[in-house]
Amino acid sequence: MSEENIGENEVETPETEPSAEAEVESPFAKLEGELEKLRNEVLYAQAETQNVRRRLEKEKADASAYAATGFARDMLSVADNLGRALAAIPAELREDDRIGSLLTGIEMTAKELENVFQRNGISKIEALGAKLDPNRHQAMVELPSADAEPGTVIQEMQAGYMIKDRLLRPALVGVAKTPEA
């Protein structure tokens, strides 16, 4: 009987040992899986934090760069009116000494406004001779032209402006079209 017990014990021992190893490995495998999952979650959280930080930095830079957009848009009418005032003075009055100082004052004011625009990243859109760009130009009329290629800006009714890389106001333009024969 003792031999039978020994035989049974020997047979049982190999069967119980893999089971014990499996039980020991199972918690380690489970812990390694959880550890890997937590590592991935930490990496994801770090990446998300970095993305949020970048987005906030960009929003902050945009806010400071474009903070004056509304005010700048309002000032464009001042620039337009100064230009109209200068254009309305006939050549014969420009030679008159009595008008000369007024003209000089208007020119200096227009130049100073242009300098302020430049310092704040506001630039005039060069429209004449350019191809119509719907992102910068607003076509108001098509004009027949034998000299210009169709789709080319041949008339500027109102100047357009950019503030840094954004459109502040589109240029109102006339575009060439093929003349009717």
From Swiss-Prot:
CDD domains: GrpE. Keywords: Chaperone, Cytoplasm, Stress response. GO terms for cellular component: cytoplasm. Belongs to the GrpE family. InterPro entries: GrpE, GrpE_coiled_coil, GrpE_head. This is Protein GrpE. Residues 1-26 are annotated as: Disordered. The lineage of its organism: Bacteria, Pseudomonadati, Pseudomonadota, Alphaproteobacteria, Sphingomonadales. One of its GO terms (molecular function) is unfolded protein binding. Homodimer. It is found in: Cytoplasm. GO terms for biological process: protein folding. Its main location: cytoplasm.
